[in-house]
A protein has these predicted regions:
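Amphipathic alpha-helical "output/dimerization" segments
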Residues: 137-158, 244, 340-341
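Active-site-proximal, acidic helix/loop segment immediately C-terminal to a metal-coordinating Asp/Glu
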Residues: 237-255, 339, 343-398
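A short, aliphatic-rich beta-strand micro-motif
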Residues: 101-104, 110-120
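GAF sensory/regulatory domain recognition
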Residues: 45-49, 57-82, 221, 231
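… and, occasionally, acidic/histidine-rich disordered N-termini of signaling adaptors
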Residues: 163, 167-346, 398-413
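Signal-transmission linkers at sensory-effector interfaces
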Residues: 1-33
Length: 413
């Protein structure tokens, strides 16, 4: 009798050693090189196929949208995918090994006898369903063994996903850095402040890479271009489209062409590069210091506001539709206006007006105009601060604006 007990203990010890070696071997193989997630699950399947006590097995792993069958032994994977976990299981409600019949899963689950949950940081990350168990000794032996194997696998899968996420995050960070560099190069480094006019700008991006653009270009000794634009989308694609827009604009300005030619050419350039999938709203104005006249085109953009010294307000509306959505512009009207002394011109993007309070009331052009009329004689930097302070106070989202905010103001002396 004693000899039989010793033999049994030796068999159990050898089995435990074999199981430990198996788990360690699997752990080594899974970390030896960068396996894909599918390869990791396949390695576990091959390991389990060599275990004579494992006849029926399913491994459900938690993924983004619930649990998914990743390993199936003793049945077809497509058949296993038809099995549905109960809400209790989906919520991670089974945290200890349990008889499947106690879960009342239905006849489709009759071949499975035991469910072994796999926990990481006290959260259920997988379930192992086992069937074909010969006796209670086999059941008790398999619980820690399969739990250890599954835990090793899930750990390797999580590490692989974290590694992939780190690579993806690094790529996104690099993309953001490139887009930020491109965007920084687009904006003018200095703005005119001379005997004829003074210009100020403010730019508050909603995300790390905004979709707004502004520019001031000295064409010759008398004329300069004022431009504010809003590009659809964000990120590198938007910054590249913005770069194309600026390059085309500056090339046309160097050639000495008029707005009536510049705008259709820019539209054609944008349509050719984006295929009509992206667009730009823009305001382009050319001011002549000598004649005090402003020629402009409003391409589907927010109307700039011109405040005269006598209190009159003019919205600069003439122009065309947004650029880049069609190959040929259906209409184009170049506006022209004289700028009296002591006038104030405000160009901006829709991030300044499309701000909503707790009752869903919009700040709008009326709100912008009200701030301008109260503060029009403030120094331009302080005027910008007051505009930003006003929309911040109005917004239901405190300092979080729903879009980029760009302000370009010009005071004519």
């Amino acid at each position: 009798m004693r000899d039989e007990q010793i033999k049994k203990l030796r068999r159990e010890l050898l089995l435990k050693q074999f199981e430990l070696d198996t788990v360690l071997g699997v752990a080594h193989d899974m970390t030896a090189r960068d396996h894909t997630v599918d390869e990791l699950y396949h390695m576990l399947r091959l390991t389990l196929q060599g275990q004579r006590n494992v006849v029926q097995l399913l491994l459900f792993a938690r993924e983004d949208h619930g649990f998914k069958v990743r390993v199936a032994l003793g049945c077809d994977l497509a058949e296993a995918e038809k099995l549905a976990l109960t809400p209790h299981l989906l919520a991670g409600g089974v945290t200890n090994p349990q008889a499947v019949e106690d879960l009342h899963l239905g006849e489709a689950w009759d071949r499975y006898e035991l469910v072994i949950p796999v926990l990481r940081q006290k959260q259920v990350v997988a379930y192992v369903f086992v069937g074909g168990l010969r006796d209670n000794d086999v059941r008790q032996q398999l619980i820690p063994f399969l739990g250890s194997l599954a835990n090793t696998l899930i750990g390797a899968v999580e590490n692989r996903r974290l590694q992939a996420q780190r690579v993806a995050d690094a790529a996104v960070r690099k993309e953001i850095e490139i887009a930020q560099e491109v965007q920084a190069m687009l904006f003018p480094r200095s703005l005119p402040n001379d005997a004829h006019l003074a210009i100020e700008r403010s730019y508050v991006p909603h995300t790390e890479i905004g979709g707004d653009y502004y520019d001031v270009v000295e064409i010759d000794a008398d004329r300069l271009l004022l431009c504010v634009a809003d590009v659809s989308g964000k990120g590198v694609p938007a910054s590249l489209l913005m770069s194309n827009f600026q390059a085309g604009l500056r090339t046309l300005l160097r050639q000495g062409v008029e707005l009536a030619t510049i705008v259709p050419e820019l539209n054609h350039l944008l349509f050719r590069n984006s295929g009509g999938e992206k667009f730009i709203t823009a305001f382009l104005g050319i001011y002549d210091r000598r004649t005090r006249r402003l020629q402009y085109v409003n391409a589907g953009h927010n109307d700039p506001l011109l405040l005269l010294d006598d209190g009159a307000v003019h919205a600069l509306k003439h122009g065309t539709v947004m650029l880049g959505i069609m190959e040929e512009l259906p209409l184009l009207r170049v506006g022209e206006t004289e700028i009296p002394a002591h006038s104030l011109l405000l160009l901006y993007t829709d991030g300044l007006t499309e701000v909503f309070d707790a009752h869903n009331n919009e700040f709008g052009e009326e709100g912008v105009l009200a701030v301008l009329q109260r503060n029009r004689y403030l120094p331009l930097p302080k005027l910008h601060q007051e505009l930003l302070r006003s929309i911040n106070a109005f917004s239901a989202h405190d300092a979080q604006f729903a879009d980029d905010v760009t302000i370009l103001s010009c005071r004519f002396k």
